[in-house]
Amino acid sequence: MHLLIPAAGSGRRFGADRNKLLLPLLGQPVLAWALQAADQAQSITWIGIIGQPGDRADMEALVDQLQLATPVSWIQGGRERQESVFNGLRSLPSGAQQVLIHDGARCLATPTLFDRCSAALQTCPAFVAAVPVKDTIKQVAADGTIAATPDRSTLWAAQTPQGFTVESLLRCHRQGLKQQLAVTDDAALLEAFGLPVQIVEGEETNLKVTTPADLAIAELILKQRQFTAAIA
């Protein structure tokens, strides 16, 4: 399975002047945790890191340091995530038919999740890793008043990996660019063009590091995993 990792995270919310994926998390950069999990997954045979030119030297040095068994390629990203993934799709090895897209900021994804997602692509053409929503969700109007309360039993929180056939995702990206569609994840592109996307069970701990609080929570989860592994 081919894996693309968009890795152009901003450090703005951290008050940092560098990519948040290069910030330290329990002794190594945030990105390192996602790379190591993908490397340990039995199904992942190639990894493409999609980043910005200013981060290339640091990220390539990180890959060298980790000494991963899985081949890793660097791919230059675009101005927005959507353009970056499109660049990544066009840079896949010749003959690639299926692809997983995984945000580098979701550094707690496990090898088991990557393998489960890879297996899902053998039975469905497109999916999103997701977990059921636990909180009650409120739809709010512009003036701050509650407009609606959706039925929680039908709501899922989308994560990554998200999986697709390369042909269908490339086609949707090209159509999206022509129509100037702006989406927040790749599954939304397929949805916009009427293509079915299924749900694959994600992981409750598969959070996205966006704020300093997320980084602190991620550290606690990793420490718990290390403790559990040590006493097993």
UniProtKB/Swiss-Prot annotation:
Catalytic reaction equation(s): 2-C-methyl-D-erythritol 4-phosphate + CTP + H(+) = 4-CDP-2-C-methyl-D-erythritol + diphosphate
Protein name according to UniProt: 2-C-methyl-D-erythritol 4-phosphate cytidylyltransferase
Catalytic EC class: transferase
Family, similarity comment: Belongs to the IspD/TarI cytidylyltransferase family. IspD subfamily.
Keyword line: Isoprene biosynthesis, Nucleotidyltransferase, Transferase
Entry's EC annotation: 2.7.7.60
Tree of life domain: Bacteria
InterPro entries with a match to the protein in the record: IspD, IspD/TarI, IspD/TarI_cytidylyltransf_bact, ISPD_synthase_CS, Nucleotide-diphossugar_trans
Site (Transition state stabilizer): R13, K20
SUPFAM superfamilies: Nucleotide-diphospho-sugar transferases
Pfam (any one): IspD
Site residues by UniProt (Positions MEP for the nucleophilic attack): R152, K208
